[in-house]
Amino acid sequence: MRVLLAPMEGVLDSLVRELLTEVNDYDLCITEFVRVVDQLLPVKVFHRICPELQNASRTPSGTLVRVQLLGQFPQWLAENAARAVELGSWGVDLNCGCPSKTVNGSGGGATLLKDPELIYQGAKAMREAVPAHLPVSVKVRLGWDSGEKKFEIADAVQQAGATELVVHGRTKEQGYRAEHIDWQAIGEIRQRLNIPVIANGEIWDWQSAQQCMAISGCDAVMIGRGALNIPNLSRVVKYNEPRMPWPEVVALLQKYTRLEKQGDTGLYHVARIKQWLSYLRKEYDEATELFQHVRVLNNSPDIARAIQAIDIDKLR
């Protein structure tokens, strides 16, 4: 099976990709989105979102990375897709699933689900702009407020010439509510298409991955939030390995505090460490205590000192 690391805006950036791919076996990472409006973006924008472009589109541990674009205008999606692959991206991905109100208000992300023709035109323009040997993928949800257009959306992606389709098994309006996940609908799309379909949504452990694949018939999954809950989730999902022990999680957090974010004004680790701990609390009781300890800290050096001060040997 293939396991992909999902794009998560404001969460899974290049530093987190570096950490997670070092302790996992991901087949591919998709970047946070590059927002495309009405211009060809400068090279520095692509390098900021995807510094791996300067390493043959791979993380330091060797996992492939693909740039994701978000926008609605085919011409500019095409030009920026061409630039992404010229800079070394291993193909490009089109975001048609982001449920953010800000993103949707500007006509991008899940808004495209309302009009599958827009998805077709955007994906087709990107496909024509990218050399045939490089993949063009599209990430969608089942629809905006219902799944009525799910087949029309899927057909648009395939007819546009996309290489593969990632389907998040909920509508935009359903957000991330667990009770609404519909792996069966993903399976219906998979049966309809000739291109590979990758299942996404509510994959938290080996059991849920097996259930998702059994119901959908997909042999590839994309994981997002779960990858933060259990830092070695791809190995759990692929090989039924146990979750990472807490001392190893702390060691990973310590390494995270030593990584420098370009352009950081001293607040990056404050937000990101607290954010990651809020995910870890769902799986590790120890993360709750650590979160309470650092939640009052408001600058990166203090956060780093607090995390670095933990004696891992005493946790074993």
Swiss-Prot record:
- Species assigned in the record: Escherichia coli O6:H1 (strain CFT073 / ATCC 700928 / UPEC)
Q: Which InterPro entries match?
A: Aldolase_TIM (IPR013785), DUS-like_FMN-bd (IPR035587), DUS_fam (IPR001269), DusC (IPR032886), DusC_C (IPR042270), tRNA_hU_synthase_CS (IPR018517)
What positions constitute the catalytic site?
A: C98 (proton donor)
Name of the top EC class for this enzyme: oxidoreductase
Q: What catalytic activity is recorded?
A: 5,6-dihydrouridine(16) in tRNA + NADP(+) = uridine(16) in tRNA + NADPH + H(+); 5,6-dihydrouridine(16) in tRNA + NAD(+) = uridine(16) in tRNA + NADH + H(+)
Q: Tell me its family.
A: Belongs to the Dus family. DusC subfamily.
Return the Gene3D superfamilies for the record.
Aldolase class I, Dihydrouridine synthase, C-terminal recognition domain
Keyword match Protein transport: no
| Name of the protein this chain belongs to | tRNA-dihydrouridine(16) synthase
